[in-house]
Amino acid sequence: MNAAAKAGKLARAPADLGKGGVPGDAAPGAPGAAPLAKEIPEVLMDPRSRRQYVRGRFLGKGGFAKCFEISDSDTKEVFPGKIVPKSLLLKPHQKEKMSMEISIHRSLAHQHVVGFHGFFEDSDFVFVVLELCRRRSLLELHKRRKALTEPEARYYLRQIVLGCQYLHRNQVIHRDLKLGNLFLNEDLEVKIGDFGLATKVEYEGERKKTLCGTPNYIAPEVLSKKGHSFEVDVWSIGCIMYTLLVGKPPFETSCLKETYLRIKKNEYSIPKHINPVAASLIQKMLQTDPTARPTIHELLNDEFFTSGYIPARLPITCLTIPPRFSIAPSSLDPSNRKPLTVLNKGVENPLPDRPREKEEPVVRETNEAIECHLSDLLQQLTSVNASKPSERGLVRQEEAEDPACIPIFWVSKWVDYSDKYGLGYQLCDNSVGVLFNDSTRLILYNDGDSLQYIERDGTESYLTVSSHPNSLMKKITLLNYFRNYMSEHLLKAGANITPREGDELARLPYLRTWFRTRSAIILHLSNGTVQINFFQDHTKLILCPLMAAVTYINEKRDFRTYRLSLLEEYGCCKELASRLRYARTMVDKLLSSRSACNRLKAS
């Protein structure tokens, strides 16, 4: 999140400047003022519009700002509010930077650009009211998923290009396109945000000289300081495309100097498994000579977009596990691909539905990946426990909070009937699953009809309640028994959810294994999440090795998510520390049982 300007400068700006706003990239963990949250008023008043906002939950922090949910007192509409203390913004360049952000961003309005809804100040703070992007950014998606499928990458890249085309038509160079500045709304639509480094081209042929950008995405002409223009955004999109498909940035090293050297030398390699058409477009965008790169307006005419399958929508499940594309095999076949203009009509041309029972089963998540996740989690917990986080002179647990790491899925209910059938559970999206005693799994989606069946070897197949083989009849009957047992009223509400386009591509994480101790039940999901529910006080831990984070639900049902590395730095209360020690023992037990199981299979 970029620093805002001190209000003294803003007060001298034109009166209507206060109606603008600028999105900020909430980079949790960046240095900020610790006492900020205590000083911010609970009710915020925009003196121009007389709109009143009530401050809600913390969303993130970065630079000089903190971000909170704020709700309009009259309409109850919720926005993210970026709040900057004036006391921290005293330098002239900070004021200039904020003025530039506002003057640029207030002039923009596009489907794929973060919107703003207000900008005002009081004697102590500057407030910016933004468009809410509930699904965070592509950075969190990248941390959870690493390399995406090609159709997903194409889906996101197309929207990034459309947003950037709009910027360039309006003579704006973003200059800091990166995963963390590409936000996602509830429909997984991309919104370009954070215009802190953006600039306006004042005349044709103007070359900017400022050194700016993020190391992994910075263009060589910016590093050389010979002048740069619109082409830097195309370079950044090339880096983004590489990252989405390969799982890491093209020039990334552990040393900043080495990264810059690689960028200047154009030293990167594309793995052989990447589609040659995709590799070709990456190479076109990552040319050292900016004039040799395609313009932003030429990109969507590339074969990567015109001949490849682009989903009209993606399901929320894609944030944590790959989707399934077997429902549209003809669209994926190069010999029968629709042109971009047809695919991009979205809702007007939904993908053809196909009988679910004919879908090819999909096998995902190897044992090696699962063990790797558990090993990572064990190492993360070992590290935080070794720091003795509760034994500090000053514990600042709130500084370790990172809402961007909130889990996508967790188990909200469970019932143990393993003496006869298995363990039933409900996920937070109201889908219901059963891990049967024969090690097969069956999941009923929250639409009340779609089914996902996972065989003992991990092979997945997709069916419906109304269309399934007779061999599954008993298991579907048992699943319905579990479903009714786990609060019929709540699940009826879930079953009434209107299916949205893209849901036909959904795959849900499933329960891989579980066990009980005297103190807790331990649940291990296929997306790497480990959940521990404590019996005595009903507290819960939800651990994610991919985000290196823990969500703690205390006795009062307060839901807080922390980065483990920040708990190591800032400390935590004794209650959380003791549960983290217990969690390490349980993860070690999970890992040991998997290793023993694999040794048995090998012998």
Swiss-Prot record:
Region ranges (Activation loop): 194-221
Transmembrane segments: none
GO MF term set: anaphase-promoting complex binding; ATP binding; identical protein binding; magnesium ion binding; microtubule binding; protein kinase activity; protein kinase binding; protein serine kinase activity
EC number per UniProt: 2.7.11.21
Biased composition (Basic and acidic residues): 351-361
Location of cross-link Glycyl lysine isopeptide (Lys-Gly) (interchain with G-Cter in SUMO2): 338
Job of this protein: Serine/threonine-protein kinase that performs several important functions throughout M phase of the cell cycle, including the regulation of centrosome maturation and spindle assembly, the removal of cohesins from chromosome arms, the inactivation of anaphase-promoting complex/cyclosome (APC/C) inhibitors, and the regulation of mitotic exit and cytokinesis. Polo-like kinase proteins act by binding and phosphorylating proteins that are already phosphorylated on a specific motif recognized by the POLO box domains.
Name of the protein this chain belongs to: Serine/threonine-protein kinase PLK1
Species the sequence originates in: Rattus norvegicus
Top-level taxonomy: Eukaryota, Metazoa, Chordata, Craniata, Vertebrata
